Amino acid sequence: MQFPSLSCGILIKRYKRFLADILLPNGEQITLHCPNTGAMTGCATTGDTVWFSTSDNPKRKYAHTWELTQTQAGDFICVNTQRANQLVQEALEKRWIAELAEYQTVLPEQKYGSENSRIDFLLKADNQPDCFAEVKSTTLLTENDLGMFPDAKTERGQKHLRELAAIAESGQQAVILFAILHTGIQRFAVAKQIDPQYAALFEQAKNVGVKVLAYKAQIELVLGKPISMNLQFSCEI
């Protein structure tokens, strides 16, 4: 998956969950939309480098969207939770996920379950039961390179586990895929200390046959096309 063209600045603060102020290289301060409802622990430290996209939609109140954090330790984190589903959808359609490569049809955002839910992806294949796949963006880095989910209590996440467990018990396939979007994470575990109820439901779901996958994204910046130059002005972040 390729990001749109990104610009960068230095994070001043995140506030009201969905907003963040950053300082651009030219000294201008702007406000970004933050597309992440989580605690963003370790992803929003003052002084980190923020990479953002810019929309040309005139109806948007905030034209800029926070996409990546580059921490002062050098790690990259994708904080736009929508990117997790886009990344996984591409991987499913190209059959890059070995455990799910048998499914030919990928249907995003399908209604299902008894709690008025939407599954991230409904997967279909000839002569196979349907597979219901839920994606969780994972960015919380703890000690010893351990990544954890959730980073805050999540009633919505608890509901998803109940729905997936019911699917598995009905004889269909159910999968929860943790998309690791922090380059510093090397291992994964459920954050029982943050949301004990989620951890309990996770164990129940596993025990009734919900499959658990964790895939780490490769996040990198690469050299792009040449641009015009103004040699009379330069700045550094």
UniProtKB/Swiss-Prot annotation:
HAMAP family reported in the protein's UniProt record: SfsA
One term of GO molecular function: DNA binding
Similarity annotation: Belongs to the SfsA family.
Entries under Gene3D superfamilies matching the protein: 2.40.50.580, 3.40.1350.60
Protein name (database record): Sugar fermentation stimulation protein homolog
Disulfide bonds: none
Top-rank lineage group of the source organism: Bacteria
InterPro entries hit by this protein: SfsA (IPR005224), SfsA_C (IPR040452), SfsA_N (IPR041465)
